[in-house]
Structures are given as structure tokens and as C-alpha cells.
């Protein structure tokens, strides 16, 4: 499973942060300096686009260099390890898919008492109770964090997960249950849970409050993006006010499998100019050609707009979910890049170096 966390918040920082009012104060951070990768990518773009496009790129305003999110000294990793995990309590565990959905997904909240300082985009590990068939403790499983650094209760003392119960039939016709996912989905409030981490820097949010952030998720891959979006639209900070574009694409099999839709509806109503969301419901929707509506199919409807955004130094793409989504998205980008005479594989490498293409699939 993919992994993700939220920010370590010091006592003074926590005091400076409150839940958002209907009209939060506008606070802007300076735009960060340009990385070498961004510079190289600019050269690549200039060398390969048509004369018209090259002129447009050359005329674009100069960007300041970006500060790498991975070099932030405040990001904590591996505070708790498997041999000495943190033991939290389950405070809440709720099924968030409808009864007729193909599979169960649960949203759960654990107490941390502020001892697991995480950031949006990180993950935690969970060790299920009991032992394996060899009599040894179960190995940890990583899960993307689904809450902002403040947590669902806004006090920086909880962490939330979004977990799908794994149940399948093997080649021998036996029903197999995933050890950790079933342990988590069966947790009752008050139960202990062993937690490790936080871990990961790949999926950390960009610091630029004016960034364009494109989020591509399938199923429980929505977890890190819920953490992003809560920070952007449900919370108020003295030093951060999101004023860019957050564009979410979420792919699920059925409408009864849509996760956190009510929350996203509220965000859309609150910030219609800053938040867009498009769903791809593969078993219920088709495109104009009658093809099933997968996430890449939905993205294809906006491909020119997405490509124009990808040419900008302040656009960041995050992908989380099933590994199969990656190829379909690459196929779209290959054809779009080719129209501008750009090799997508090379261009994607430059995006990755500039921390503008971030992938966590499983």
C-alpha cells in the first residue's frame, strides 16, 4: 500500500493554526527559486517545440528557483520503528463505501498525542496484532496518511487512514483475507494499534501557495490528496493560504465506491476558482466512443488543458493508487508531447528532477 504523512507541527506552529472560517485571511508565501532541473527542462522545451511555441516559452516571465521539499529540515522520518512502535488508540472507524460497493473501504482515526509529527504526503506503518504462520510478529504495512498535519480534529494529536479491506479468492478456490487491512477495518474504538514512521518525502506538498497541483487517484490512493485538500480548503494558517489550482481526478469502479465526495463538494462550493474535481466511474460511465471511463479516459477529455499546465514551472503532478493507471496516463502524455515535437520520456525525467512528477503506486 502507498504511504503518506502530514507536517510536524511545533507547539508554536500549532498555536498559529486554526480551523478555517468561511472567509479565511489571505496570506501569501514568496515564490521559491528555480532548480537546475527546471532550467534544463526549460531548455529541452525550447529546443523541441515549434517556432510559435518557442517564442511563447521565451516570452514567459522568469521563475525564481524552487526550494526542494525533500530538504526541509522540519520533515521527520522514522521516529518510530518496528522494534519500538508507537502504540496509539483507535478513536473512530467508519465504513465510507455503500453496502452495494464492490469491497469495503474504512476511514479510521488514531490518537498520537502529537508524538508522530507527520506532513501531508507522508505515510505510517501499522503492525497487526498476533503472529504469522511461523510464530513471528506480523510485518508492518505502509498506508498513506489521509489527514492533514493538524489531523481530523484540528489539534495535531491524531492521524487518519483510508483502508480497503482485502478479501480475494486464490487459485485453489480459498478465500484469503489481507492480514493488516482486515485487522484495521475490524478495529473498535479504544483498541490499541502499533504505529511506525512517519516515512516518505516523495509525495510531500509543494510549498508554493500559488502552485497548480494535479492529483490523480484510484480508490484508496485518494488518501494523500485528502490530506492536501484539507490543508488547502478546510484549515486556516497564518503563513499559508492556497491561491493556486487544485485539480483532482478520482477513478473508482462504481458511484457507491466514491470516497469523501461530500467533503469535496464542500470544497468546490467554498473555492470554485481554486478546486476542480472530475470522477471516472469505470462500470457506469463511458466516453463518446463508448469506452469505459477510466481515470486516463477522463483526463483525455481535458488533455490540451492539462498539457498547457504541464509546461509551467509551478505545476505539480501527483499520482497515487493502482499501478495500472500509470501506463494509461503515459499514453496520453506521449501523444500530447509529440504534437509539440517533445519526447515524453525525456520530458518526464526533467519533471521528476524538478519534483513536478510524483508517483506512488502499488
Curated annotation (Swiss-Prot):
Main location, first listed in the record: plastid
Query: Gene3D superfamilies of this UniProt entry?
Result: Nucleotide-binding domain of ferredoxin-NADP reductase (FNR) module, Translation factors
> Which GO cellular component term is one of those annotated?
chloroplast stroma
The cross-references to SUPFAM superfamilies, in alphabetical order and at most eight, read: Ferredoxin reductase-like, C-terminal NADP-linked domain, Riboflavin synthase domain-like
Residue positions annotated to bind FAD are 141-144, 162-164, 168, 179-181, 220
Question: What are the required cofactors?
Answer: FAD
- InterPro entries (alphabetical): FAD-bd_FR_type (IPR017927), Flavoprot_Pyr_Nucl_cyt_Rdtase (IPR001709), FNR (IPR015701), FNR_nucleotide-bd (IPR039261), FNR_plant_Cyanobacteria (IPR035442), OxRdtase_FAD/NAD-bd (IPR001433), Riboflavin_synthase-like_b-brl (IPR017938)
Its UniProt pathway annotation is: Energy metabolism; photosynthesis
Q: Where in the cell is it found?
A: Plastid, Chloroplast stroma; Plastid, Chloroplast thylakoid membrane
Q: Which Pfam families match?
A: NAD_binding_1
Q: Does this entry carry the keyword Iron-sulfur?
A: no
Annotated S-S bridges: 180-185
Which GO molecular function, any one, fits this protein according to its record? ferredoxin-NADP+ reductase activity
Single GO biological process annotation from the record: photosynthesis
Top-level taxon: Eukaryota
Keyword annotations from UniProtKB, A to Z: Chloroplast, Disulfide bond, Electron transport, FAD, Flavoprotein, Membrane, NADP, Oxidoreductase, Phosphoprotein, Photosynthesis, Plastid, Thylakoid, Transit peptide, Transport
Q: Does the keyword Amino-acid biosynthesis apply?
A: no
Q: Which residues bind NADP(+)?
A: 144, 164, 220, 252-253, 282-283, 292, 321-322, 360
Assembly, in brief, is: Heterodimer with LFNR2. Component of high molecular weight thylakoid LFNRs-containing protein complexes containing LIR1, LFNR1, LFNR2, TIC62 and TROL proteins. Interacts directly with LFNR1 and LFNR2; LIR1 increases the affinity of LFNR1 and LFNR2 for TIC62 and subsequent thylakoid relocalization.
The text of the family note is: Belongs to the ferredoxin--NADP reductase type 1 family.
Protein name (database record)? Ferredoxin--NADP reductase, leaf isozyme 1, chloroplastic
